[in-house]
Amino acid sequence: MKTQQFFKGLNTINALLLLTLAFFTFLMARITAAYMPYNTDVGFLRIKQDYIDIDHWRIAFFVHVYASMLVLLAGFTQFSSKIQDYYPRLHRAFGYVYVTDVLLITGPAGLLMGVYANGGLPSKISFVTLAIGWITFTAIALAKAKSGDFAAHRRFMIRSYALTLSAVTLRAWKWTITNSVELPPMDVYRAVAWLGWVPNIIAAELLLRSHYLRKRR
């Protein structure tokens, strides 16, 4: 009965958003599968051969790649009011998976990887800032939930997930740029280091502002 009510309650926009997120999660799963079980001569790692023998970097990379899939999957369940209404325990369980993964696994691994980013200082600053912002927003979201301020919890989860989606948008920007203009690969890398997450957080803030303004009318 709950399942039937859940699907009846989904409107077209929500259903399309969930399908879009599921599609991008599937694409990320395909990218991740290329590194399994332990492939160091594929994709991104081909430009990181100088670092592949550094134990802590290599461990951080594979931890980040594999654990990121959990973050994407757990994260996109957090913004459906229907899941919250009909399956509150599932919502909380996935929420704890998401928060634990970001705060203890994927976030710290991403921070370490940012220190070793290609493209010099601009790229390093971008990826380190991204990791710190991701961890910070997620930690605040958890604190707000524990204090019972669920409106603030939702706002910070939106910010956190906007940064989670940088894994997808970075690759989308890279594909768009490389198929539109001819630039040196490292220039593209520096550009997408920022484009991968800055527009996401701007979009999240615009979404939050518009929602806040609608509620005040």
Give the predicted meaning of each segment.
Residues 1-217:
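Alpha-helical membrane insertion/targeting regions
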